[in-house]
C-alpha cells in the first residue's frame, strides 16, 4: 500500500492476473494525446470511476453528489500547478466547471462513439 492509502492492505481489490486494468476512455485519451507534443495534467471532475453495480469496467454518468465531491480537488490542482488552459472532456465536465466558475473549453467525450470527434475537436483548441 502506498503510504497506507492504496493497495490490498487499504481494502482495494487488485487485478487478479497482476496486470493493471485499461479503462476504455483513458486508453482513447492517452492514444490521442500521445500523438501530440504536449503533456497535460489530467483530472476527472468526478474523482472516482462511476460504474454500474457489480460491473467495474462499465461506465455510467456520475451522480450530482459524486461530481460535487470532486470540486475541491479540481480547485486544489488548479491552484497547485500553473494551469494555462482548462479543457473539459465532455458535457458533464464542462457543466461542472462552468457551475464552479472555472473557464474551460469543452470537447466531445470519447466514449459511446465519440473517439473521432474528440480527437478532431481537441486538435482545434487554440493555445495548446
What spans do the regions from the language model cover?
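A polyanion-binding, active-site-adjacent surface
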Residues: 1-85, 95-100, 105, 112
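Alpha-helix/helix-capping structural signal
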Residues: 91-92
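Short, flexible loop segments at boundaries between secondary-structure elements
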Residues: 101-128
Amino acid at each position: 500500500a502506498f503510504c497506507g492509502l492504496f493497495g490490498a492492505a487499504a481494502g482495494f481489490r487488485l487485478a487478479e492476473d497482476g496486470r493493471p486494468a485499461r479503462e476504455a476512455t483513458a486508453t482513447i485519451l492517452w492514444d490521442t494525446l500521445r500523438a501530440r507534443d504536449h503533456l497535460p495534467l489530467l483530472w476527472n471532475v468526478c474523482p472516482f470511476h462511476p460504474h454500474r453495480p457489480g460491473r467495474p469496467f462499465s461506465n455510467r454518468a456520475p451522480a450530482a453528489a459524486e461530481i460535487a465531491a470532486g470540486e475541491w480537488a479540481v480547485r486544489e490542482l488548479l491552484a497547485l500547478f500553473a494551469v494555462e488552459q482548462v479543457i473539459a472532456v465532455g458535457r458533464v465536465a464542462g457543466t461542472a466547471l462552468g457551475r464552479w466558475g472555472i473557464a474551460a473549453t469543452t470537447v466531445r467525450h470519447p466514449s459511446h462513439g465519440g473517439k473521432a470527434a474528440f480527437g478532431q475537436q481537441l486538435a482545434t483548441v487554440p493555445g495548446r
